Amino acid sequence: MTKAYPALLSLLAVVALTAADKPAASGHAPVRDAAWMNERPADNKMVYSGQQLDTVGQLVDVPGRLLATEFAQGGKILLVKTTTVLASLDAATMKLIQKADFPIAKAGGSMHGLAVAADGASVVVSGGRTHLYRATVAADGKITWGASIDVSGGAKNVNPLGIALTADGQKAVVALSMTNQLALVDLVGGKVVTTVDVGVCPYGVALSGDGKTAYVSNFGGNAPGAEELAEPSGGTMVAVDKRTVALRGTLSFVAVGADSLRETGRLEVGLHPSEVLLDAPRQRLFVANVGGDSVSVIDTATRKLSRTLDTKPDHDLPWGMLTDGLALSADGRTLFAANAGINAVACLDLSAAHSAPKLIPAGWYPGAVRVRDGQLFVVNVRNGVQKVALPTDAKTVADYDARARAAAHLAHALRYAKGPRTTTATAAPVPVPAEVGQPSSIRHVVYIIKENRTFDQVLGDIGRGNAEPKLVLFPRDVTPNHHAIAERWPLLDNYYCNGVNSSDGHAWASQGIVGPYREKDRVGFRCAYDFGTDALFFAGCGFIWDHALLHGRSFRNYGEMDKLTKLKGKTYDDFFTDRQNGGGKTAFTTAFTIDALRRYSCPGYPGWEMAIPDQTRADVFLQDLAAMEKRGSFPDLTIIYLPNDHTAGELTAKSYVADNDLALGRVIEGLSKSRFWKDMAIFVNEDDPQTGGDHVDGHRSFCLVVSPYAKKGALVSKFYNQTSVLHTICRILGMPPMNQVVAASTTMEDCFTTQADLTPYVCLTPKQKLNEKRPPAAKKTGFWPPFPVGDDRLTAQFEALDFSGPDRIDDDTLNRAIWAQTRPGERYPREFMGAHGKGLKALGLRLDPEAADDDDDE
């Protein structure tokens, strides 16, 4: 036994490694991106974040995003709540018994909320919008649904989350996250007895042993004070800091009577508090702080904060553990915390005053944990339920800890989180310095974010690298600039988007991490879909521009996260024609919910609005660039949003993409002919791939790297993703990485050389018309709609698509439409659409088993 880990080592017998721990039979070598990645075990699997999965124990697949877990029938049955079903498993064998679809399928399950009564059979589940689902679990694990209970009080969406049941199982206290209330629900009568206001977005709930006190975590803290900054979330204003990140988290104490609720106190805890866990015998309450990388420990007798536990295995690691689920050992000495940000469970020794937690490797994105009979059960949001025997010998403890650290690249992250390791005076400038703070030959970074294309859709016909011409939708005639840029500078054919739609895609592109508030809320609609409009969605690390400003860098934004552009009854054709005629007859207004971004944004640059051509966006930027040329100053970091490759319904898909291509070419040409070109790097990528077609996988996309220092004509097949871009930007600008996931990502040295070529880029004009309209009577011609002639149902589905915001559409319908337009008469290759993973295995990468479920836009 080791002194550093007494609580865990005293639990039970030695862990027995299952087949899941043995080397993979495929024989494929891991992708070797850099020296630090060469050291990982050959059986590890890489996920899109660049992290490895080295899961120990058994892992059982359950469909959907996995959200919560509890035991039933005296611990014999393990229940797992997902976005779509309540699943039951034999806790001993981990055999999946049943997947019971929720009674209200369209509502699904909310991101939290599953409770089992003391009888071990009665179950209550929080639905996605307005209802609680009641069920009975038999001794054999079979689930039978009972009557659902409407807890909405007439509201459209209250989004119930945490649930706690009274000892007799007759009543429940339920967090109503959208109305900021705690409800007392009569489960027998099937009605809400009363409600009480608590903090913003109540999340987790626990009930004292006597049933007289409820403890409620408020994910958004208290309502903002009169002098505090505030931004919206779910119809409620949230107190925020200057970055528009939530200012605080709180815990409410609520007195519970037979038919009454009364808030009796409130205590500040960590940021984004989620699950609460009551240890009644020891008068302790644990609160997981997703945004605080910590667990708050409350003395329930005094109602005061007794200590804060750091869930980082090393205090110097960057922010980003994303601590969510909690469980306590039977002896009360070890707290288990699900660290979703590093795919591990942290084991915290509560008997030690200060002790760094040891780690147990989990699956992808652990979100809930439970402990019973010496076994740890982990619900991994992205890839299944895990069962592992808790280790009792020092060797296994050390092995698990080392494996979890290696899989999450913690040593790599720690190295770069600590800042400069050598003096800048002794290092020669290079494009991507080896260490934080060393000089870069690049001074200005331009980051261009576009919408929704895979690698094969655009570059499948490029004639080199891992490309598939049979899947290209927008060939050289449509995208001559994309092709020319990828041919002149590096072609990256192993690059991936971390997200699956614009909601999490823009988060990955600008924050490099996504918390459980979004990862778990796939059908519950607590988290706003439009990224940039929900303050509780924003990660504790802030955005890349916050990071740059914090480190004294200058910044300018063109359109990113301006989701509220308003038009005055104008169409794409109106803007296109007005621009050709000299302008002045069309107008729009912009608006931002992120105050810090508003202050650094070009007021005349439109954000999301498919009726505005990307040519207009290029015009505005180039005018601004000309003014900066005269002033002789250009920002250290510039973000430009060019969204029209998303496509919409007014024009043909090729016209939208050609418009986007020409705008990109014009921007690149303008920058390359400017006085700032000599020390500039431009990164161009998509926010997400929109489950499009690609022969490797639907997450594979393209990244264009443009610079005098970018390698000419190089083929770069190393694994990169959106967090690689962010880490590279940070390194170039002399900043430490902004969070744990970014810190663990590879930087993109292989795309650059030390020899500059200042030759400017010359924009090419697409052969495709930029304003080719979709024929209104196309159903009769077969050209449009893109479905079999006479299929009015699918035609109606396309006509009903909502293009008012990014990805508010059914991906399959739009993808079928684009395919039929661009490759008329050819069979739709459904097998290569979305997250199919057919080409990942050969690259040492892993398919998310639940990715197909993720790809559906809400």
Predicted segments, located by residue:
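Predominantly soluble domains enriched in secretory-pathway, periplasmic, or organellar proteins
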Residues: 20-430
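Bacterial N-terminal signal peptides
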Residues: 6-16
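N-terminal pro-sequences and low-complexity stem/linker regions of secreted or lumenal proteins
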Residues: 403-858
